[in-house]
C-alpha cells in the first residue's frame, strides 16, 4: 500500500502510531509503519534515555517524536509557579476531566487541592527549546507539536535538520 506518506518517510505502510511506549515505537517502525514517541511531560534527561534506547533497537528505521511546545512560548521568563500554571487550565477542562473520573468512580473531591509538582517546565521558552534540542540530537524523521502549530524555533530547527514537522489539533476550528 503505497502513498505520499510512505514515499516521504521511506515506510512500507501509511501507518503512524503515536505512543508513550518506546517498545511500540520500535516495533511499529520495524514492521513498516512509523512509530512516534509521545514525549509530553518528559524531562530532557528522560527523553534522552528513551531516544537512546530507541536508537539502539530500531535498526535504522524512521521514527518521530511528539512534544508539547506552545507556539506562544507563553512563559518566556520561566517564572510562573506551578499554581499559576494550574490556574491557566480552563475551568471547562478541569470539569470535563473530573466528570470522566467521576463516571469511573474515582474520588475527585480533592483532585486539585494538592500543590502541583514537576509540571510546566516545558511551557517556557528555555524548557521547550531544551527538549526540542534533545529530540534533534537523534536521527528522527518527524517532529510533531501536540499543541498545534509548532513554535518557530522548532520549525527552523526541523528545516535545518531536514526533518518533517507536524501539528496535532483537537478540533477542526483550530
Task: Describe the function of each predicted region.
Residues 1-174:
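Active-site entrance/lid segments in N-terminal catalytic domains of soluble metabolic enzymes
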Amino acid at each position: 500500500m503505497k502513498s505520499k506518506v510512505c514515499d516521504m518517510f521511506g515506510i512500507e505502510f501509511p501507518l503512524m502510531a503515536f505512543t508513550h511506549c518506546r517498545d511500540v515505537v520500535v516495533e511499529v517502525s520495524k514492521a513498516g509503519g512509523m512509530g512516534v514517541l509521545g514525549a509530553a511531560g518528559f524531562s530532557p534527561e528522560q527523553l534522552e534515555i528513551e531516544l537512546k534506547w530507541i536508537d539502539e533497537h530500531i535498526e535504522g528505521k524512521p521514527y518521530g517524536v511528539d512534544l508539547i511546545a506552545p507556539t506562544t512560548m507563553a512563559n518566556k521568563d520561566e517564572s510562573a509557579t506551578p499554581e499559576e500554571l494550574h490556574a491557566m487550565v480552563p475551568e471547562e477542562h478541569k470539569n470535563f476531566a473530573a466528570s470522566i473520573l467521576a463516571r469511573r468512580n474515582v474520588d475527585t473531591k480533592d483532585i486539585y487541592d494538592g500543590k502541583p509538582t514537576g509540571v510546566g517546565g516545558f511551557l517556557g521558552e528555555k524548557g521547550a527549546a531544551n527538549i526540542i534540542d534533545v529530540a534533534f540530537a537523534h536521527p528522527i524523521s518527524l517532529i510533531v507539536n501536540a499543541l498545534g502549530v509548532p513554535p518557530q524555533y522548532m520549525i527552523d530547527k526541523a528545516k535545518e535538520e531536514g526533518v518533517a514537522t507536524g501539528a496535532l489539533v483537537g478540533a477542526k476550528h483550530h
